[in-house]
Amino acid sequence: GWFDVVKHIASAV
């Protein structure tokens, strides 16, 4: 889902 994308971005930051 889109939340997985959000967590991915959060981890990248």
Curated annotation (Swiss-Prot):
Q: Name one GO biological process term.
A: defense response to bacterium
Q: Keywords of this protein's UniProt record, alphabetized?
A: Amidation, Amphibian defense peptide, Antibiotic, Antimicrobial, Secreted
Q: Where does the record place the modification Valine amide?
A: 13
Kindly list the GO CC terms recorded for this protein.
extracellular region
Q: Determine if Secreted is one of this entry's keywords.
A: yes
Q: Where in the cell is it found?
A: Secreted
Q: In which tissues is it expressed?
A: Expressed by the skin dorsal glands.
Q: Which domain of life is it from?
A: Eukaryota
Q: What does this protein do?
A: Uperin 7.1 shows antibacterial activity against L.lactis and S.uberis. Uperin 7.1.1 is inactive.
Q: What is this protein called?
A: Uperin-7.1
